Amino acid sequence: VIDFPISNMSNSGIDHIQVYIRRKPQSLTAHLGTGRHYNINSKSGNLQILYSGLGMNMSLYNNDIASYIENLEYIEQQLEEYVVIAPSYMIYTQDYNKLLNTHIESGADITLLYHSVDNAKEYFLNCYAINLNKQKGVLSLEQNHGNTKNKNIFMDTYIMKKDLFIELIHKSRKTSSVYTLLDIVNASCEDLDIRGVSHRGYFAAISDFNSYYESNLSLTDIKTAQNLFV
């Protein structure tokens, strides 16, 4: 599944990619290799695998913010003005360069990608949903409890300036050791201009075995597969 976000980034012209993982990286390192098969192994680009060495067995504290804190120097070293953050458990195709342009043109502080679904009662129960105003400004993020069928499922994909990203990392750690990036972004909805952009095309969230099975089954349909691969 991790091949999809990396391919999206590579196909969007992003050649500095950092992969953050929660557990020991041997198997993932072997799978990703140098990144050559993603067309990012060039003189100017690289693929880094980073993780939090502290609290490896303390899953509550070993979250994305913990990994960012421990590898902050690698983030600060990057010369790019913007960061694109994407999940490893969601399957979709997206031109991040186009999404970045939309973000810049909007003047927003943060842009979040979401997918509108009409089956949220049965699916995406481990995901978060975005509550939007009429101008697609993000009011809040809340876990999908399956109470309604129509939801804007947050695709765990963010775009923001690198400096703001670093600021949120520090703010999150000061607030709580268990805070995630999603938590601090959600807490910042009133203070920052956070906007949602709707995704079109195939979308699946692989959060358990059933969702893995369902997504594979859906891709046996030619029209469905074309929405992802064409």
Residues of each region from the PLM?
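Conserved N-terminal catalytic core of the sugar/cofactor nucleotidyltransferase
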Residues: V1-Y82, K98
